[in-house]
Amino acid sequence: MPFVFPVFRGDPVGRLRLSAGLWVYDGLSAFRNIARHRSWGHRTTLRHEPQLRADGLRGAMHYYDCWTDDARLTLETVQAAVGEGAVACNHLGVTELLRDGGHLSGARVTDRVTGASFTIAARQFVNATGPWLDRVRRLDEPEGKPVLRLTKGVHIMVPRDRVGNRNAIVLRAPRDGRVMFAIPWEDQTMIGTTDTDYEARPEDVAADADDVRYLLDAVNAYFPAA
């Protein structure tokens, strides 16, 4: 996917420094990406992104990065594992971790659909539960200290023709200078992400009005007609 990183008067990082970093980025792909990064001037940038704010625009860096459908990628990974002999079970919640001779030997799980409970025995365990990692750890170590610092990342979706971006755009939030993106997603533009501390239950996470305003302020600063 093509990305455009606009540079405006007063930005903390100019095109020269961005180019130096993007040479490293190109090198990480062994220079086998679709194309190497390019530096655009004011006119070229507006030719490619005519809805971008012209006032104070110095130019932009153009480069390529990868994108994926995260849900599809996850399902494909599970299906590939099953194809190699793994057993995949959905809608199971771990309620107890079992030990035998001081070592983990199994997990007590409950089917969230039927309510049935049963035990799964194993020799090796991987706690890949994302933001619920500490909750699962405490089934085995009730007094264990948290190892995660939870943060909330919010995206919003708006009609792409409302924003007017043709490429993925790198944005800096006016409020704190944080880097985020406006990414084309079919006929929508996905704007985000935020990154704020979060202390409630992961399953209760939701965007609030301040999150939405933070993201809208960022995209409006770059696309005034939006």
Where are these regions (language model features)?
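Dinucleotide-binding Rossmann-like beta1-alpha1 core, especially the glycine-rich loop
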Residues: M1-H48
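A conserved short coil-to-beta-strand element within the FAD-binding core of flavoproteins
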Residues: N90-S105
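Short aromatic/basic micro-patch
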Residues: S39, A88, T119
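Active-site substrate-recognition segment that forms the wall
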Residues: M1, E96, T119-I120, N127-A226
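Helix-loop-beta segment of a Rossmann-like dinucleotide-binding subdomain
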Residues: D26, L46-E84, L104-R108, A116, ...
